[in-house]
Structures are given as C-alpha cells and as structure tokens.
Amino acid sequence: MFYPDPFDVIIIGGGHAGTEAAMAAARMGQQTLLLTHNIDTLGQMSCNPAIGGIGKGHLVKEVDALGGLMAKAIDQAGIQFRILNASKGPAVRATRAQADRVLYRQAVRTALENQPNLMIFQQAVEDLIVENDRVVGAVTQMGLKFRAKAVVLTVGTFLDGKIHIGLDNYSGGRAGDPPSIPLSRRLRELPLRVGRLKTGTPPRIDARTIDFSVLAQQHGDNPMPVFSFMGNASQHPQQVPCYITHTNEKTHDVIRSNLDRSPMYAGVIEGVGPRYCPSIEDKVMRFADRNQHQIFLEPEGLTSNEIYPNGISTSLPFDVQMQIVRSMQGMENAKIVRPGYAIEYDFFDPRDLKPTLESKFIQGLFFAGQINGTTGYEEAAAQGLLAGLNAARLSDDKEGWAPARSQAYLGVLVDDLCTLGTKEPYRMFTSRAEYRLMLREDNADLRLTEIGRELGLVDDERWARFNEKLENIERERQRLKSTWVTPSAEAAAEVNAHLTAPLSREASGEDLLRRPEMTYEKLTTLTPFAPALTDEQAAEQVEIQVKYEGYIARQQDEIEKQLRNENTLLPATLDYRQVSGLSNEVIAKLNDHKPASIGQASRISGVTPAAISILLVWLKKQGMLRRSA
C-alpha cells in the first residue's frame, strides 16, 4: 500500500549523512521523511567517539556555517576539546572533541524530533520506485510505499555489509545491526558502477580493568574551544582526560605470528581499507622498523565504562585480540567488552554523480556518505547537508548548488569524488585543498553563511549573530587603521616595550598588528589601542585578516584566474571523439568522466594542459564556448 501523504524528499538512513540531509531539506521548507531501520540509533557513532581533526574539523565548521547540526551536537556532548596544530598557522589549525556517545545521540535525536517539516519513520528500505529513469519513492520491508520528488541514499556500511572477526564472517551493517541486502541488490540492477570497500574498528575495553596510574594523561585545552559559531563553552558537559599507552615488541610478535588468521592477509576480504586509519596488523607490517605505536585510550562517555583504544583497529580472531590488548602497559589484566572487527560493504562510484550529489543516470536520486567511498562522520555530514539541500531544491524545481574548491572544503571533497573517484575510503586533509589559506576553520561562516541564508538553511538567530560579527570586524579594523602613534608621542615608550625594533615613524594599530611579535590581545592592552573587542570570534578575525592580508590577496588572485576555467562549461552530451587532436587516452577519460567544466576536466588524471588547449579551441570553433555567470 501507499502511505497516504506524499513527501518532497525522502532520506534513507539515519547516520551522520542522513541526519544532516533530513535537517537541511526540512529547514528549507520541504516535507521531509527520514526512514531508518532503528530510531534509537539516529546519530550513532559507529566507530570512534570523536568529532573533528585535521581537515575534518574544517568540514564540521562549514556544516555549522550552513546551519547544520553536527557542531551544535558535539558542543553539547564533547567531553574533551582540543585545538590541533595550535602552534602552526590558522589555515591548518583544527578543532577536535572526544564525545560522550549517549549525549551525542540524544542531541541529534532531540534536534530531529523538534525540526518542523520532518517526519521520522522506523522501517528498513528494500526497494526504490523508479519510473522512466526518475526515482519517485521508496518501498519498506513491510511493503509500505512512500512517494517523493527526490530520494537521498545515506546508508553507510549497510549495503551487503559483511563483518569479519578472524576467518569467521557474517552479514551485518555494523555490530548489532542487520545489513541491507535487498536494497543493495536493487541498486546493483541500476546503471551504476559498484565496488567494495572495507573499514574496521578496535575492541572496546572495560575501564575498570585498566591500570591508569602507570599511563600518561592527555587533557583538553583551557580555555575550552567550541565547535559551533553559535556555541559557547558553558554548553560543554564535564571534561575528562584520555590516556596514552604503546604497543611493543611483544604485541608485534603476537600479530606477526597470527597473520595467517587475519582475513585481510588470508585474502578473505576483497575490499580496500582506509589508508590513513590502518589496522594494527597493517601498521606492524607496513612500518616494520617501528618497535612501538602510540595508542590513545579514549573514554566512550561519562556514564560508560567502555574505553575506545584508538590505534588498534583489527579483524584478527578474538583470542589474538586478547593477547594484543594484554601485551600493552596498563592493560595486562584488561577485559574486552566488544570485539574489534572489519566490515566490508558496497559503495557506488562517485564519478557517476553530479557535483550536487545527484545521480547522472537516475533523476532525483542523491547519494551521500560512505556509499560514495568516503570514511568519517564529518565527511558524511558534509555530503549529507549538500545532498539534502539539493534534493530540496530539485523538489522545488530550483537549480542545484555546489560550492567551488575555492569556497569550501566541502567543495574540495565533492570535486575530488566526482572528478577523480576513489579506490580506497576517502578522508579529508588540509593538504587536499590548494586554497587552504582561504579555507580556514575560523572563517567558515564568512565564506558560507550568506550563501546558506540565500538557500534557506540559516535561521534568523544565526543570521543576526553573523551580521553583528561582520559589523564588529569592520568597526574594529577601521578603529585600528585610524588610531596612530608617533615615535615622539607619550604612548611610544609603552608601545616600544612590546616591539623588537622601536618605532621609527608614525604607525597605525594595523601597522603594529602586522609585526610578527605583536598580537591583538597584546596590542589592545596598550593605552592608544585599548579596549579589546569582547566578541572573541570577531577579534580573532581582525588579527588574522591584518596579519595575513598580503598572502590572502595573492591567493585571491590565483582563485580568480582559476575561476575562468571553472566557469567554462562543457556540454553533458558531448562525445569527445568529435574533438580532433585529442589522444585516445584523453578521449576515453573525458567520455568516462563527462566533466561539467574545463576546470573539472583539467583535474582528471591523464588530461594534459595541451589537451585542454585543444578542447578550448575546438569549443570556440564550434560556437560552444559557454561560461556560467
């Protein structure tokens, strides 16, 4: 039977991609349905209890700048907050927080249940309703059919998921959850390229069986960072430390002598694992010269005794896992409460997607999260938000939107996936962005909140706070530009005491702030330049904008040059065999990828600058050279 009411957008899956997709579509005023196999696991952290990190924290801030949920949820659930790369430049600084799993899940569910235009329904989805290459709905396990103008697939590792512990394996979406086999089979019938990937998780340890007294502690930062531009540290729950132990030669001997029982090394697992989050058996074999590896013991929550040993993800048999755990300092008597495992699952080639994350072959069908070959909660959340907002725009007969590489890490993520595809689980790093000086955590709102407002994602409260911040930045910069001190002035001695070279000519507040030894905090304690802004976010922007002004201007010039290529559109139906002068390799790659622009074509491996020149000349001759606004 059909459900009596139609929807604008259906989201299938309630993980980190699905929850952001559902919230985005509903915020934009579309009637949205979130279908999940279990309402109690909405926003579940399936692997490590943490949000953020290098590159990942940038994505969380961007999701927040567009009105998303993840940053707000972690501010309410984070039990240890740190700034990574704090001693380096602002472009690569990143926020990371340990999470209380239960508090995080509660924060996500509360937000979903209180979001207007959003209905949550518990049923596994087994089929899609596709008519004339357009998706028009979904069918659940009990045969109930829902109609919609757009469908977003955010099914994580559940598609034909297979869990491996040693040489034993069984079907599962993650430990304790069933896989989605009928939906996987249905998707394989569609004209989509499919592959297999693998990820893993470590065993969980009972904290009461660990001797923490012999281990080094790792505390969070003070003052505590916050993730959301709307957040503050008073929202954070109680803060707790993590602990550090190490593997040793005994650990490595145990692993080496049991490799024949590893599904990875025995050839049982076909899927490729994540390069930047390798299993402990991979680390021992790939880095044979290392006699130890650092392991972080991370609490899973304030009311849980479970400890997540970050760094020993494994699919070795349970008896070997016990030996590995007990070989490490402080863990000699440790007890495992959940075994580690590897999970293998279907993913779909993201090169078959438009930059909006809509399928090139099935109209109205969007893909987001691990189904696109990514790894990580943050990468999933960012894709979910993008897919959700574009599903909402499609259902409202509006053009899709995707950020450029120069606008957001989300733009880098989507362009990498849709242009290059991936053969291993894709993780975001700052090194993937060529314009990272512009794409900082601290300015995510300055880059994206105005766009979010135009798209209908940003509410009045966030918009008012954003405009107040902009005014504070502008007013303070004008104040510092127009406040001067001369070498002969009474205040010069006070200023000189903080400079490596004394004033030799008249200087404004901005001139002084450009000096490497001067900070905004120090400057605003000096008589001519006091008082400091009470708006800490605006104060941070003033300092960064002044200190890095020259570098930022240079990068802006580079972006404007590249924008010409990004805006030169390529016809979706163009058969590149018509273009004389292109090599067979280039023709094959362009026909395979079907890039949307010259910029995208130039990033395809094997497409040379000479080929781009030939293509531009041919387009001009044919009268097909078009540029977007």
UniProtKB/Swiss-Prot annotation:
What are the UniProt keywords, alphabetically?
A: Cytoplasm, FAD, Flavoprotein, NAD, tRNA processing
- Localization per Swiss-Prot or TrEMBL: Cytoplasm
Q: Which SMART domains match?
A: GIDA_assoc_3 (SM01228)
Residues bound to FAD: 13-18, 125, 180, 370
Cofactor(s) needed by this chain: FAD
Q: Which SUPFAM superfamilies match?
A: FAD/NAD(P)-binding domain (SSF51905)
Could you tell me one molecular function GO term of this UniProt entry?
flavin adenine dinucleotide binding
The residues that the entry says bind NAD(+) are: 273-287
Membrane-spanning residues: none
Question: What GO cellular component term, any one, is given?
Answer: cytosol
**Which is an annotated Pfam family here?**
SAM_GIDA_C
GO BP annotations listed: tRNA methylation; tRNA wobble uridine modification
Positions in coiled-coil regions: none
The text of the family note is:
Belongs to the MnmG family.
User: Which PANTHER family does this UniProt record tie to the protein?
Assistant: GLUCOSE INHIBITED DIVISION PROTEIN A, PROTEIN MTO1 HOMOLOG, MITOCHONDRIAL
The UniProt subunit note reads as follows:
Homodimer. Heterotetramer of two MnmE and two MnmG subunits.
**What this chain does, per the record?**
NAD-binding protein involved in the addition of a carboxymethylaminomethyl (cmnm) group at the wobble position (U34) of certain tRNAs, forming tRNA-cmnm(5)s(2)U34.
Put simply, this protein is called: tRNA uridine 5-carboxymethylaminomethyl modification enzyme MnmG
What is the species listed in this Swiss-Prot or TrEMBL entry? Escherichia coli O157:H7
Q: Which gene encodes it?
A: mnmG
